[in-house]
């Protein structure tokens, strides 16, 4: 089962409106951010968990500003709530792992993406994602 299939399954298992909006990802849907984070030395103890939580946060970003991969809804309010829920899901799982460095790095990504959207600078959001994923993975030269 792919990381995005696992994320969709978790949303369905929670029940409620998000479960109803959860869909299987398209074949070949990109989960590269989670895969990159999971492949780094900082995620070595729990790579599958890191892949899932990074992709949960990425899905939250896409629910807010783009095209989500495992959610389908025409209700903009539900999409925003889903995005917030997915941000919280990923950050909560990181906190449970005790990885405060990664919590900070991905919280910074969320803030930078909100700023980039407000300023209509999508390239800044993608740059923030690249920096954040490298930081979570431990491949960025930053201290942990």
Q: What does each of the following model-derived ranges do?
A:
Residues 3-144:
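Mg2+-dependent prenyl diphosphate-binding active-site environment of isoprenoid biosynthetic enzymes
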